[in-house]
Amino acid sequence: AVAAKELAFPSVVIADAGIKTASALEAFFMAEVPDADVLKVRRLAALYIIEASFEGINSDIAFAQMCLETGFLRFGGLITEDMHNFCGLGAIDENNRGCRFNSEQEGVRAHIQHLKAYGSTEELRMPLADPRYRWVQPKGKAPDVYALSGTWASDRQYGEKLAGILKRMARF
């Protein structure tokens, strides 16, 4: 039987604990994109949970944001898969295509740290991986997904889009 917590709607608060297991995140992702690389999705789901737990950040939100920012790992914009940039960090235009990271783990850590800069005033617990962390001011300016609209991204519906992904994730 699935625990009641597993069926609960994920929190929209950034500095909160995620409730989804890696296998639930994987099942959600594969339901959305059945032809995705399941091993990559499995690795990323585990990394998001681990890295988010280090920083006290909601892994459900971070994973959902990765899905939104990468088009469910299809990429296709300024960021390419080999950049290990799962959240559009530094991507502005053709002259500023975004930050490049050496590994999936480093890219996930940078994403979690950048999300922490928006969602919390607490100091980082892990070594800095996010080259843009210092530019987020004031720290904690977006305590939930809705407050990311117009700040993390210029899209005024950004928070609604993230909440929509979290709602779909709630079934897993």
Predicted segment positions?
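Catalytic cores of secreted/periplasmic lytic hydrolases that degrade extracellular macromolecules
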Residues: 1-172
